Amino acid sequence: MKSIYVRLSTLAIAMAVSGWAAAETYIVDRYQDDTDKGALRWAIQQANSKPTEASEILIQAVGKAPYAIKVNSPLPEIKAPVKIIGTQWAKTGEFIAVDGSNYIKGTGVEACPGAVEGQFGTNVRTTTLPGIVLRDINGVTIQGLEIRHFCIGILMNRASNNLIQNNRIMHNYGGAGVMLTGDDGKGNPTATTTNNNKVLNNYFQDNGDGLELTRGAAFNLVANNHFISTAANPEPSQGIEILWGNDNAVVGNKFENYSDGLQINWGKRNYIAYNELTNNSNGFNLTGDGNIFDSNKVHGNRVGIAIRSEKDANAHITLTKNLIWNNGKDIKRCEAGGSCVPNQRVGAIIFDIPGLEHAHFVGSRGHGVKIDPANLQKTCNTSDEQGCNAQPNQNIQAPKLTLSKGQITAEVKAQPNQRYQVEFFGNTSANSNEAEFYLGSAVAATNAQGTATLTWKPTTQVASVTATLTDRVGATSELSSAVKLK
């Protein structure tokens, strides 16, 4: 008997050391915003009182739907590895709301001041008036909630290894629905503080930006979310903005009705794949080096993929297997992005679309933002111009396509003695100059004069064919002019 007791005691100690000890659970079954037992504020305080221990906050459905906890002042920041779960979602798909409208007052975006005095709303630096705050903390889960009427729905500031899943994020007009930022408190990025977070299967509606990955946010996964803006949104800016964020994966999301579905500002090596972007002014609005855009569906926008000029003349962006159709719509929506320049080129892939850092940008740069005109950027039109940015994406030129006897000839004019990849796309209309279907690829190697010719025969019945050219480091051209097969 004594030996059994010793073995059980040893097992209990081992379980405790290995983290098998039962996590504390706090039940929220009162929607009053106070510190009495059963309130959300009380539950967060209890979890925070044990900052090294994992726990759960289970928010129950109380009364009849819709279920809402209206908070009267900022909630405590999350300081412990806790799971905060609205329990009704797993039962019926209904969300339990956490609502900030009782204490965030004002007219629209004016209720949300930025970090710089006189600035407010979306597209200014801000961490102001968030709903749920994860700062300098790891291992938090948020599920089954509707988070609404804050300036930022969820702020993840220098926070890693957290999960935001199966929530509805709505009407957070100031900063973003969810903001992942490495901001050090002074606007500087931190490289290793906001990593390996997952934002999965959420619905974002009518936030300023839907989601932001900024100031060093890296190696995060944003997947299978729906980002949508409606007429109720005072600043339909970006579905996702990546600002100085690197090595993130954005996969399988949908973006509708923004100035830009997704905008990258000088982020590097982000992988953006299998997303759908429709009814935006720009589907993608891009700068940065080493970003890859793979197998996205881009349709019904003014510009499908816009690539801006930037100060880094070596920056390159890779476009591969993207399906692009029915763009060129008259969608002039330009909140810190979009394409509203009169008479500009529109369509599938367009270089030198101006952003808010460019002198010829037309639109809002953010409320209260003042930029010295001398600091605004311009794009060089000739190779000998000074004081301007080089043409985007290495100024790589699309191949020239011709058709003869059912075969397509692609002529490449580029750098000498280099490997290039030509991707071919098809369209259902003979008059289309886009990329509705991906048909295949071929390799071309240029000679000492920088030219190459290859022949390729389509195996799929299409009415017209276009192509892009990608160099050995990953810079991709605009689409070629189409050849008609019918």
Regions found by a protein language model. Give the residues of each.
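Edge beta-strands of extracellular beta-sandwich domains
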Residues: 474-486
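Parallel beta-helix/beta-solenoid
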Residues: 79-80, 136-137, 142, 158-160, ...
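Cleavable N-terminal signal peptides
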Residues: 10-11, 21
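Bacterial N-terminal signal peptides that target proteins for export
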Residues: 1-9
